[in-house]
């Protein structure tokens, strides 16, 4: 039982720490989306439940697959926006290659630096 109190204290102390720059931009992008995109929107991103907390939009995870399958999944799920972040390795592994292979299907809406974080409109 005494060991549990130490773990709780550690969690409490971690909660007080600042976010890393990547996470800070991830949440700032979600806040920007909430302020600037009216109505309903579907957003594909790496950590959808966390992004939703600040974006107040419907979020989902993109498919972990080749670029063709990622694009098909975005179309099937009627995605409006995607987030290219620097916090989730699968974004660079799966979502970014789809954006690079089909640049005509994506339009930059917002960009944050240090590290680069992008909100892209998906053209269905």
Which residues make up each language-model segment?
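Transmembrane alpha-helical segments
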Residues: 1-23, 31
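Residues at the C-termini of beta-strands that transition into short coil/loop
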Residues: 2, 47, 63-65, 112, ...
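Alpha-helical elements of the RecA-like P-loop NTPase motor core of helicases
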Residues: 3-6, 52-53, 93
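Flexible, glycine- and charge-enriched loops at secondary-structure boundaries
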Residues: 19, 23, 60, 67
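Short periplasmic/luminal acceptor-recognition loop of GT-C membrane glycosyltransferases, typified by
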Residues: 34-63, 81-86
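Periplasmic/luminal catalytic loop of GT-C fold multi-pass membrane glycosyltransferases
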Residues: 67-123
């Amino acid at each position: 039982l005494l060991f549990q109190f130490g773990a709780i204290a550690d969690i409490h102390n971690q909660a007080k720490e600042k976010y890393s720059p990547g996470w800070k931009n991830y949440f700032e992008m979600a806040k920007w989306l909430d302020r600037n995109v009216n109505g309903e929107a579907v957003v594909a991103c790496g950590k959808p439940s966390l992004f939703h907390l600040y974006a107040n939009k419907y979020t989902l995870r993109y498919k972990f697959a080749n670029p063709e399958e990622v694009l098909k999944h975005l179309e099937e799920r009627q995605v409006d926006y995607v987030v290219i972040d620097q916090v989730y390795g699968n974004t660079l592994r799966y979502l970014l290659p789809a954006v690079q292979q089909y640049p005509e299907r994506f339009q930059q809406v917002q960009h944050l630096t240090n590290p680069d974080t992008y909100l892209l409109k998906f053209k269905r």
